[in-house]
Structures are given as C-alpha cells and as structure tokens.
Amino acid sequence: MALPTARPLLGSCGTPALGSLLFLLFSLGWVQPSRTLAGETGQEAAPLDGVLANPPNISSLSPRQLLGFPCAEVSGLSTERVRELAVALAQKNVKLSTEQLRCLAHRLSEPPEDLDALPLDLLLFLNPDAFSGPQACTRFFSRITKANVDLLPRGAPERQRLLPAALACWGVRGSLLSEADVRALGGLACDLPGRFVAESAEVLLPRLVSCPGPLDQDQQEAARAALQGGGPPYGPPSTWSVSTMDALRGLLPVLGQPIIRSIPQGIVAAWRQRSSRDPSWRQPERTILRPRFRREVEKTACPSGKKAREIDESLIFYKKWELEACVDAALLATQMDRVNAIPFTYEQLDVLKHKLDELYPQGYPESVIQHLGYLFLKMSPEDIRKWNVTSLETLKALLEVNKGHEMSPQAPRRPLPQVATLIDRFVKGRGQLDKDTLDTLTAFYPGYLCSLSPEELSSVPPSSIWAVRPQDLDTCDPRQLDVLYPKARLAFQNMNGSEYFVKIQSFLGGAPTEDLKALSQQNVSMDLATFMKLRTDAVLPLTVAEVQKLLGPHVEGLKAEERHRPVRDWILRQRQDDLDTLGLGLQGGIPNGYLVLDLSMQEALSGTPCLLGPGPVLTVLALLLASTLA
C-alpha cells in the first residue's frame, strides 16, 4: 500500500521533510520502487488515463507516456491497437514490468506474424502452442533465446511451459544434448532437469556455470556427480588448475567434500590469491555487512541440523545468513588454520571476518592472527592497528599471503596500507629490528628501511646493517642516512681499503666531512652518482685537491653537474685559481683578490643565492683602495 502513496509524493512538490523520509525508506529497503512506475531506463511514467484510446497513431507517443500505461486501459483496446502499442514499445525500447508484459500478451489473442517487431521480453508471455509447425516454432524460440528468461521466476507458469515446447521444437529426444541444442535453448538451459545434466555434462556444465539463480536440488546432485566422476570438460578434480577453478566459479557451491579434498591444495591457494585481485569478486564484498543485513541475520535462527561442529568443507554450501547463524565465533577462532584449505567465496569470508570482529572488538589475539591466511586480505589498517604482533613467523605468514598484492597502485614503491600497518605494528611490538626481521622485511619490500622515521631507525642494531643491500637505500633521505651511516661505519670497521668502500658506499649520504677527507686519502675513485648524494654541508669544506683525490678519474664529471647541488654550492666556495687547476672549465669560484667572511654556515645552506654560495656573506675587497693610497 506504500507505493501508490509514494509515487505522487515523489513526483510532486512535497515538503523537504517528507521527501527525506521517503528517501530514507527507499534506501533502507522498506519501500521498493514499483517497476510499473519506472523502467530500467530511469524514465518517469506520465499519467496515461485515456491517452492510448485517443491518438490516431500510438507511435507518436513519447517513451515517457508509453512507460506507465495501466493494464485496465489496454484491456479496452482492440487487438490491432494492442499490436500497434507493442510495436511502438519495441521501437522506443521502453522497459516494461512483468504485469504490463503479461497484460499485453493476454490481449494478443492471435499469434503475431512479425515477431521481430515486438519487444523481446513480451514473447516470454505468449503461449508457445500458438506457434505450431517447424518454421513457426523455430522462429519463435530463436527470438526467445535472446530474451531475458530470468524475468520470469522458475516456478512461473509461463516459464514452465517454455522448456518442453522448446525441446520439442528443436527435436530433442531423450536427455542427450548437443552443443548446438544448448545454444538454441539459451537461458532455458538453466531449467533442464538433473537427468539432462547427467547425460550431457560435457556441453551443459559450462552453461550452468553462468546461470544467475541457484540450481535446484536435482540439478546440484547431478552436477556434483558429474564433476566428481572426472569426465569432460573439466576432468578429474585432482588435475584441476587455477584456470579450471576460474571456469567453475558458478558451480563452486555444488562441490562436495570428496571433490574439494581431491583438488591440489596449492591450486586452491593460488586460485584464492588470484581471485582476490579480481574486481568482479570485490564489488559485492562490503554489502553483506551493512547494518540492515546484520539486523536481519541476527534475528535468524540456525536451521535444525545445520549447527557447525567443526570448520570443514560442508560450510561452503551455507548461505551467508546460515554461516552467521550456525557458525560459533569461538569455534572459528580455534580452527582458523582450517579456513585456508576451504574454497569459501569472498562473501562468505566477509561473514567469517564479521564474526571474529564481534568476538574480538579490541583486536585479534596473535593466536588467531597467525592463521588468518587469505582472510588478512580483507583487513583494513584500522583493524590491524588493534593487533599486537610479535612473532616473526606470524609476519612471514601474512607477508606470504600478500605476494602479488605488495605494492600500492597509487605509489608503486610503497606497500599497501594494510601491509605497511602490519609491519609498523610488528616493529613496535618487537622493540628493535634484528637481522632476521630486517632480512624478512627487505626481502618482501626492498625500500622498507626508507619508510621508517629516524627515531625508528635508531633501533636498528649495527649487526643488522650487513643485510642491507644498496637498492634498499634508494629512497632514503639525508635524515635517515644520518642515522644509518654511523651504524654502517661501526659494522664495517674491521674492513680495509676497497672492500670497506664497497660496503659503506650506499650509506655515504650520511657521512660527515672528516670521513670524506679520510676517504680522499685512500684512492677510492668515488663515482659521480654517489658524490651527488653526499650531504651538502659535508662537501662544502672539501678543498679542490681533496675532491680530485676523492673522485679520481671521475672528477671530469663535475662539469656536467656544475649547476646542481652539491657541486654548484661547492664551486661557489672555492677559489677560481684552484678550480682552474682541474682544467674542466668550472666557473663561479671566488675571484682573486677577494676575502670571504662566512657569517653563518647554517644560513649559507638556506638556499639564498649570493656570490659565494647560498646564504648571506660579507665580501670585502682584500686590497682596499685605501691601503693602496696609504
């Protein structure tokens, strides 16, 4: 009774409060919009009382006018006018409700000659007996194949009479079908009884995969037996691959425990990981935990005999509300290690996560976390911040699950937010980064060290530095290298010469001036890429001779970098005479006869351009004219 009231209110200039109330009712699902009032095109129906009976040409009516015709008005039209209306509806692609289609079909007392001119879905409501003879029925069911059969429920009388008529028309005898027969049946193939599934599994199972509604009990048993038998097209479950599991998605609820146990567990795990990245499986995930769903589920009792005694393969046959009602959260928590071996759908995993969330509102214990497996992919950073993760084995297990999901698409060099949060919780729980932890983290995410703050890096022991590779430091900034360099220097202190330089080279972005001076005496031949990453304040005090010794044959590269820091700033602090000794044509040094007084080294690094470098300096003429006069 709510719909007749809702329609004029929504279509009129009602009060904002009333409109908001109706919008709320629609959004909560307590009031459903009538399909007789608006089609799938989103058009609003116009009042049509008497419109159909008066115009000389129904095709002149707009789609908006045609959309909302009442059945009572159609019943007063002649057969010819009804046919004219049906043709106009098809031409203007007007989407009709089931009742409107049934009403039109009832008024078409004689079978139409031009089926192509009628709305496709209207044919579902016509009596197939009216199209007798091979040519007539073939033409009729060829059109039915393209219609939306699921507009009719499986139990509807119109749908029940279509399948036997179609089988007779296509000359099907017995239960053996060809691939051409299945194609000819279209959506009606989803209604074929179990005996057809048993005898024609090779051609029928691939069609049943895409059937929108659940199979009936007879069909399920036949499909299960066919799959367990290992015949074509899928073969024995023990030989299934990830692509086989993909192809069987629509039939997963049909699989029994013997079938599931026969599938290689590595294949199940790989398929689960691959499917989690498929957007088509992610779309409905969050809908099942909306408040309205939760309220409805909580009020539903577990059906007799379905209370779960253990977490096993039988649960994949449970509907979402049955999982919520029949699986005890405490049982789930103690048997989490079994979940990954069972091919739950991602909607079912949502229900399991919801149950754990209710059992542990303050965060999961580590005994549960370490067995989350693929359920970890459903966790948000907010969920993970409640955890206390201290076991390296737990961290390894969850990082293994995330292989293939490690990097964020928005920032490819950064891990996904939930992974970054997990690592953060682990590091805080452990208190320091030992070698085993660092090995694990850098193997998973090479840039991990550079994602830590200087304060967090201070917990890295020098002994762990041996596990750091050059690429692990690519994105570190000077503040981070300032912390890591002293640790690296301590770790490699017993090495000499070129071996020491090879190990320390990646950390030199944090080296002070005195260490660079020491390296210049060892003929290390530092490359320009490393030199350009040195701290500017550490490079500025170096003399031309020290830089020449530090770079060795690579000193010629200074010319190409003379406009970039730190080379630019270093040039501005050198005497031009000294720069000229390099023979590189470097310009911008201090002219002869000038004395430079640097008032503030800190200000000199502030970036303000001046004669002798970035920062305020006082330049005075060394041989002042006054002294000459004197």
Curated annotation (Swiss-Prot):
Interacts with MUC16. The modification Phosphoserine is found at residue 200. PANTHER family: MESOTHELIN (PTHR23412:SF6), STEREOCILIN RELATED (PTHR23412). Expressed in lung. Expressed at low levels in heart, placenta and kidney. Expressed in mesothelial cells. Highly expressed in mesotheliomas, ovarian cancers, and some squamous cell carcinomas (at protein level). One of its GO terms (cellular component) is plasma membrane. Pfam families: Mesothelin (PF06060). Residues 607-630 form a propeptide. This is Mesothelin. Keywords: Cell adhesion, Cell membrane, Cleavage on pair of basic residues, Disulfide bond, Glycoprotein, Golgi apparatus, GPI-anchor, Lipoprotein, Membrane, Phosphoprotein, Secreted, Signal. It comes from Homo sapiens (Human). Disulfide bonds join 302-326. It is found in: Cell membrane; Golgi apparatus. Belongs to the mesothelin family.
